[in-house]
């Protein structure tokens, strides 16, 4: 199972999406792809922070009416098991002298707690957490 980082799931919505990422997504069995509640929050925040207009409306509609329904029952929450993985990840990162962004640490903890691979462009923090990582930009 693969947990999609925000940069992967948002790539198809870019004005000029990366062809490698689109091909990689198309090659995956949909039922193996998951989102986290952290990614959903980042997507919603990104849209909310955009200038008001047609692009914002279009992205919001696509997210709420198409993307999220496509991932129904495949959105992982940050639960009590994840809190332990998060604490261990932060301690391990600090001991190694690494800084991990808060959202990445939450997503990594969700993946660790559920035994998932992470698909992301920003591989460093997830590899440092000991996760299996796929970079669709290079796949």
Swiss-Prot record:
One of its GO terms (molecular function) is magnesium ion binding. It holds the Pfam family PIN. It comes from the Bacteria. Keywords: Hydrolase, Magnesium, Metal-binding, Nuclease, Plasmid, Toxin-antitoxin system. Mg(2+) binds at residues 5, 104. Its cofactor is Mg(2+). Its EC number is 3.1.-.-. The keyword Cell membrane does not apply. Residues 2-136 form the PINc domain. InterPro entries: PIN-like_dom_sf (IPR029060), PIN_dom (IPR002716), Type_II_TA_system_RNase (IPR050556), VapC_family (IPR022907). Belongs to the PINc/VapC protein family. Toxic component of a type II toxin-antitoxin (TA) system. An RNase. Involved in plasmid stability. This is Plasmid stability protein StbB. The lineage of its organism: Bacteria, Pseudomonadati, Pseudomonadota, Gammaproteobacteria, Pseudomonadales.
């Amino acid at each position: 199972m693969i947990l999609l980082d925000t940069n992967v799931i948002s790539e198809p919505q870019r004005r000029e999406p990366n062809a490698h990422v689109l091909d990689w997504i198309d090659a995956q069995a949909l039922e193996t792809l998951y989102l986290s509640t952290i990614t959903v929050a980042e997507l919603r925040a990104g849209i909310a922070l955009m200038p008001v207009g047609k692009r914002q409306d279009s992205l919001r509609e696509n997210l709420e009416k198409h993307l999220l329904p496509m991932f129904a029952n495949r959105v992982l929450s940050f639960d009590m098991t994840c809190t332990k993985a998060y604490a261990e990840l932060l301690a391990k990162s600090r001991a190694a002298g690494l800084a991990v962004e808060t959202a990445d640490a939450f997503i990594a903890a969700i993946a660790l707690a559920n035994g998932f691979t992470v698909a992301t462009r920003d591989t460093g923090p997830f590899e440092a957490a000991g996760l299996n990582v796929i970079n669709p930009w290079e796949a």
